[in-house]
Amino acid sequence: MTKKICIAIDGPAAAGKSTVAKIVAKKLRFVYIDTGAMYRAVTYIALKNNIAYEDEKAIAALLQKTVIRFEPGEVQQVFVGSENVTEVIRSIEVTNHVSIVAAHPSIREALQERQQVFATEGGIVMDGRDIGTAVLPNAELKIFLLASVEERAERRYKENMAKGFTGDLDQLKKEIEERDHLDYTRTHSPLKKADDAIEVDTTSMSIDQVANKILSLAELKINN
């Protein structure tokens, strides 16, 4: 039987976390938990209910009454209550405001508690901004992915084009720099590399190369 370890993958926007985490989880037959999708879902419910993104108290009250769940599939499905929000939480509007919502301490605390419940039995791959430092500080394997702003903007641009969104590459660079600033400087659970995390610069690596590197590290932990 495969040892059920927890793998935490952190890093800034568009560093390739989700794509790599899905591959690693599938290969190991682990459960993938997309924490970014949870913050996006909260941002979406604020948008849907006409609540200002800065209104932490109102968003927190709404979150208390909201169930966010995942269902497996070729593309993991994300639900808010009974509504499938898999596509809408990737909209430009949500993408441009999720860092504001994610900076609210009460929102982070509420979602971190839910994320920790997901991980109680191990056998999970979880990606986000603060998994190795705040959500799963005892994870057996912690990875911190990096890539240049230019590379990340290029990746996001290609993603947007594939989804039919138009966009400006220079504008994407600016937005990523702004998200980095918000993520690294927020008071509660800022983005930072855990002391025991392994740093992987993905700038000149393919997705498969990154995934294979993490799988090799995971196998060492599983067989140790």
Curated annotation (Swiss-Prot):
Its EC number is 2.7.4.25. Coiled coil: none annotated. ATP binds at G11, P12, A13, A14, A15, G16, K17, S18, T19. GO terms for molecular function: (d)CMP kinase activity; ATP binding; CMP kinase activity; dCMP kinase activity. One of its GO terms (cellular component) is cytosol. It is found in: Cytoplasm. Keywords: ATP-binding, Cytoplasm, Kinase, Nucleotide-binding, Transferase. It catalyses: CMP + ATP = CDP + ADP; dCMP + ATP = dCDP + ADP. The keyword Kinase applies. SUPFAM superfamilies: P-loop containing nucleoside triphosphate hydrolases. It comes from the Bacteria. Its main location: cytoplasm. GO terms for biological process: nucleobase-containing small molecule interconversion; pyrimidine nucleotide metabolic process. Belongs to the cytidylate kinase family. Type 1 subfamily. This is Cytidylate kinase. It comes from Listeria monocytogenes serovar 1/2a (strain ATCC BAA-679 / EGD-e).
